[in-house]
Amino acid sequence: MKTSLSTYQEAADFLAGLIPDMPQTAIILGSGLGALADRLTDATAIPYAAIPHFSRSTATGHKGNLLFGHLGSQSVMAMQGRFHYYEGYSMEQVTFPIRVMALLGVRRLLVSNAAGGINNTFHVGDLMIIRDHINMMPNPLIGPNDERFGPRFPDMTRAYDRDLIRAAEEIALEQGITLRKGVYVGLTGPSYETPAEYAAYGRLGGDAIGMSTVPEVIVARHAGLRVFGMSVITNEGYHFADDFVNDADEVVRAANRTTDVMTRLFTALIERTE
């Protein structure tokens, strides 16, 4: 059964009653990147458990709070943890917050994630601007379409906003930040990819691979939000050593090491595009 508009509206009304001045920019903080939320000033934290119809985040490094505050001089909403298909949630549950954001007037969505490096020029700790994606998950728009959110067949030619990408590249140049740019492959997980899968998705055009982001981006674009995405490369999947083992805690540690740089970049990007 599809979630009704009134269900999304109930969550939106609850949040609007707590936060009178709603931001137009939202950030989704992925694995290990929730620490960026610690940089918010004048922050109000609302646990997901308190928000009507929100799910609970169970993934490593995801604290499960919706934050409202300021990053630099601009007001933002930040999801300190997201929902994943591999947690057993439906695609509607995974993307529920995005439609609530749209009802609250959010116009820009910045998404981040931890990802494995497919491209053999990428290294652990690199930041990759997502210029496009390859979706290997069920599409979250399958089922009856509610035209009040968006069209039946939304265009995905420019899923990631070119002006936001250009602005991020300019900021990185000004601040001496090295950025990569590439295609993110979204898989369901929860098992990490085999070496053969890394090689196969590389041949398809993928540069980095992970278990999130794509469903939220599809629903955000369906609702007309501008999207910017960034991946933190947390392993180098193109040359696994014989004794290499993917480890969720190490993914979080690798992502955490980029928090300072990502915070500077996201702060400047939000201020430049307001």
Segments predicted by a language model, with ranges:
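Zn-dependent metallopeptidase/amidohydrolase metal-coordination segment
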Residues: 211-249
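Active-site/ligand-binding-proximal alpha/beta "capping" segment
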Residues: 165, 171-207, 266, 273
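Polyanion-binding loop/helix "lid" in catalytic or ligand-binding cores
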Residues: 149-160, 186, 198, 254-267
